[in-house]
Amino acid sequence: MLELNFSQTLGTHCLTLNETLPASGITAIFGVSGAGKTSLINAISGLTRPQKGRIALNGRVLHDAENGICLTPEKRRIGYVFQDARLFPHYKVRGNLRYGMAKSMTGQFDKLVSLLGIEALLDRLPGSLSGGEKQRVAIGRALLTAPELLLLDEPLASLDIPRKRELLPYLQRLAREINIPMLYVSHSLDEILHLADKVMVLEDGQVKAFGPLEEVWGSSVMHPWLPKEQQSSILKVSVLEHHPHYAMTALALGDQHLWVNKLNQPLQSTLRIRIQASDVSLVLQPPQQTSIRNVLRAKVANCYDDNGQVEVQLEIGGRTLWARISPWARDELNIKPGLWLYAQVKSVSITA
């Protein structure tokens, strides 16, 4: 568990935190350049010293301005992966990985190398590696120091799109198989969508939203960040049943369900789905004899005018579902907050 209760002056702004972050999974730190993302993880790592407040990791105080406590970075047991890999050019990959390796990690070396898919790179020098390969080695080196927390500062920012796609599956695998919490700094919506369990949105040094990905993604805070083509909802669901004849899987969403193409997932397993706002249409009465398999009862929470379209925020079993309709449809159906209606979902994609 990471306890953050501090403030630090950043030019004309002040980075202010009073949050407790989980001891597992990936927490994404999201915001535009200058929002305070890197300043936050620099304060956690010990590279900078907040003027006020306290930082504690798993009950161990890392920084306490009032009591004059400020552990040096090497005493914090925190791994840090930068935008650039910062490997030692004169050491082979094996030497880079073993540099600073904790004795307790000796027996984990082969497993971690396998998880990151870098077995074939061990006897090569960094200069011969691609950007994605260098970052995998940098992540491995950080993990072999046996950290209690791993900080990743936009590790994909300097990579081209093919290299980003190469590295994402390894990060997803690490998140599933190692029991080390990660803070992942990014301004990429795609990276956050595929990796994050929780999201913290920073703006001018202030926390605007913090919580599970599906809650923050569907919030009014996050909504303006999503380009029109990415306006969507993220929902956590569980596998309810598999249809024996039509090769479809039912996913439980509260006391309702959605049908998707058959998944090779056991019953009761959980996953996240994404529904584009443009794939949701609205009707006032349950449709009869429709080809659309997914029709959900929902309540209108809010409506927003957006460049000639209307974004409708719906509540379904305590979750948020967005729909995009025309002003004509809104006026003709008299759609307004508090109205109960039916959402027809035309397409569902699996994100994790």
Swiss-Prot record:
Gene Ontology, cellular component aspect: plasma membrane
The record's subcellular locations are: Cell inner membrane
Q: Which Gene3D superfamilies match?
A: 2.40.50.100, P-loop containing nucleotide triphosphate hydrolases
Q: Please indicate if the UniProt record lists Cell membrane as a keyword.
A: yes
Q: What is its main location?
A: membrane
**Membrane topology value:** Peripheral membrane protein
Spell out the Pfam families in the cross-references: ABC_tran (PF00005), TOBE (PF03459)
Name all Mop domain ranges.
289-352
Please list the residues that bind ATP.
G31, V32, S33, G34, A35, G36, K37, T38
Q: Which reaction does it catalyse?
A: molybdate(out) + ATP + H2O = molybdate(in) + ADP + phosphate + H(+)
**ABC transporter domain sequence ranges:** 1-229
Q: Which UniProt keywords apply?
A: ATP-binding, Cell inner membrane, Cell membrane, Membrane, Molybdenum, Nucleotide-binding, Translocase, Transport
EC number assigned by the record = 7.3.2.5
GO terms (molecular function) for this protein are: ABC-type molybdate transporter activity; ATP binding; ATP hydrolysis activity
Name the job this protein performs.
Answer: Part of the ABC transporter complex ModABC involved in molybdenum import. Responsible for energy coupling to the transport system.
Q: Which family does it belong to?
A: Belongs to the ABC transporter superfamily. Molybdate importer (TC 3.A.1.8) family.
Describe the protein's quaternary organization and the partners it interacts with: The complex is composed of two ATP-binding proteins (ModC), two transmembrane proteins (ModB) and a solute-binding protein (ModA).
Q: What is this protein called?
A: Molybdenum import ATP-binding protein ModC
Q: Which organism is it from?
A: Salmonella typhimurium (strain LT2 / SGSC1412 / ATCC 700720)
The record's gene field reads: modC
